[in-house]
């Protein structure tokens, strides 16, 4: 069954959006729930659910589009910085299941806060996880 995708309908023009960037592979449009003024979403035109379905070509095109949109936002809105945010899966707060990157201009003293408290990790645990990621050891599983 074909599931309706809002972002695909923006790509094909059947849903209205405030498009700010358009090339052969990607589209960027204003987020209707902006965290800050100028908050855009950058998407591949081809439907891809998340980063795990994203191929190398789409990944390269999306990052190039992010860079282009970031330069436009930087030049025209003059933010102090820009965050690129990508959520993959419901547990990571993905709400639209078409791969997208939030491009969020930062102006200082805005309402977007980093909700995590940063502290140094356990060096042994960090080293152990790195070994797992490099394929040097297996994830310990209960027997």
Model-derived segments and their meaning:
Residues 1-143:
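HIT superfamily nucleotide-processing domains
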């Amino acid at each position: 069954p074909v599931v309706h995708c809002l972002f695909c309908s923006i790509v094909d023009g059947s849903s209205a959006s405030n498009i700010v960037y358009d090339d052969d592979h990607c589209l960027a449009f204003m987020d209707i729930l902006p965290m800050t003024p100028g908050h855009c979403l950058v998407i591949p035109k081809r439907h891809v659910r998340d980063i795990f379905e994203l191929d190398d070509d789409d990944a390269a095109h999306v990052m190039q589009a992010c860079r282009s949109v970031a330069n436009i936002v930087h030049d025209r809105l003059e933010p102090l910085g820009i965050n690129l945010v990508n959520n993959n899966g419901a547990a990571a707060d993905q709400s639209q299941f078409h791969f997208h990157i939030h491009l969020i201009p930062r102006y200082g003293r805005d309402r977007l806060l980093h909700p995590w408290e940063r502290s140094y990790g356990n060096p042994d645990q960090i080293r152990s996880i790195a070994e797992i990621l490099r394929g040097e050891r297996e994830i310990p599983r209960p027997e």
